[in-house]
Amino acid sequence: MNWITNFVRPRINSVFGRRAIPENLWVKCPETGAMVYHKDLKENQWVISSSDFHMKIPAKERLKFLFDNAKYCLLDQPQVCQDPLKFRDNKKYIDRLKENRSKTGLIDSIVSAVGNVRDFKLVAVVHEFSFIGGSIGIAAGEAIVKSCERAIAEKCPLVMFTASGGARMQEGILSLMQLPRTTIAINMLKDAGLPYIVVLTNPTTGGVTASYAMLGDIHLAEPGAEIGFAGRRVIEQTVREKLPDGFQRSEYLVEHGMIDRIVHRHDIPEVVSSLCKILTKSVQ
């Protein structure tokens, strides 16, 4: 009996028993409801091939696909006060930071890097939306300022990929201060005669839209990206009118002259490098 219990039954269970399936093995398309194999989605730059829906892409994945041969140098994350207001909502802000750092492997919501895109050197700044909604606080603001300074030192363009809900509530007025700080940094970049290109991705809202996201020399956007300040529901309740279909989507904005061009994620490296070459040549 012991032989059956200890040897035969475990072997049978190992053959016929249920195997654990990873939770992220399949991803559901928000547009069509189709199930997509996670590995295929990742290899296709987080674009669902059947519907061409652009999913949110991790910041480092975007850098990998942007730079030539996935080679780039990450810029150091500035050291700042982590919880200046000792803020607490339903949990301590410092604990929320620890959770998001563990989840994403990042220090904060901004990742910056320098490298070559189609043999053209540039600095790229990318929002990580999964880090507290890509919100901007002291650390993110300082990272953007340092990225602008690095671009000026390297005499190369800066490309910004936005994906954010806006200012970080847990840092209060200190978060709002980053909006004029980053605006000044962008103006320094422009005063140096260097191109500043913004790629608006889904979603780009709040204080980020009200500051550096809309200060580019050229504004590109991914298909279907939500871009605006306040949300659709808030606007409708305020003006008491029904907004047009597709309002605040990139297609609506390019039609009404708010952005310059919609670019498929697969084409971004080629388009960005071409624009950088044209803009850099024009100021030489």
Swiss-Prot record:
Keyword entries, A-Z: ATP-binding, Cytoplasm, Fatty acid biosynthesis, Fatty acid metabolism, Lipid biosynthesis, Lipid metabolism, Nucleotide-binding, Transferase
Known pathway: Lipid metabolism; malonyl-CoA biosynthesis; malonyl-CoA from acetyl-CoA: step 1/1
EC numbers: 2.1.3.15
Enzyme class: transferase
InterPro entries cross-referenced by the UniProt entry: AcCoA_carboxyl_beta, Acetyl_CoA_COase_Trfase_b_su, ClpP/crotonase-like_dom_sf, COA_CT_N
GO biological process, one term: fatty acid biosynthetic process
UniProt keyword Transferase, yes or no: yes
Domain CoA carboxyltransferase N-terminal: 25-284
GO MF annotation list: acetyl-CoA carboxylase activity; ATP binding; carboxyl- or carbamoyltransferase activity
Main location: cytoplasm
GO CC terms in record: acetate CoA-transferase complex
Enzymatic reactions: N(6)-carboxybiotinyl-L-lysyl-[protein] + acetyl-CoA = N(6)-biotinyl-L-lysyl-[protein] + malonyl-CoA
Compartment annotation: Cytoplasm
Pfam families named among the record's database cross-references: Carboxyl_trans
UniProt-listed SUPFAM superfamilies: ClpP/crotonase (SSF52096)
Subunit structure: Acetyl-CoA carboxylase is a heterohexamer composed of biotin carboxyl carrier protein (AccB), biotin carboxylase (AccC) and two subunits each of ACCase subunit alpha (AccA) and ACCase subunit beta (AccD).
Its job: Component of the acetyl coenzyme A carboxylase (ACC) complex. Biotin carboxylase (BC) catalyzes the carboxylation of biotin on its carrier protein (BCCP) and then the CO(2) group is transferred by the transcarboxylase to acetyl-CoA to form malonyl-CoA.
Family label: Belongs to the AccD/PCCB family.
Designated name of the protein: Acetyl-coenzyme A carboxylase carboxyl transferase subunit beta
Lineage: Bacteria, Pseudomonadati, Pseudomonadota, Alphaproteobacteria, Hyphomicrobiales
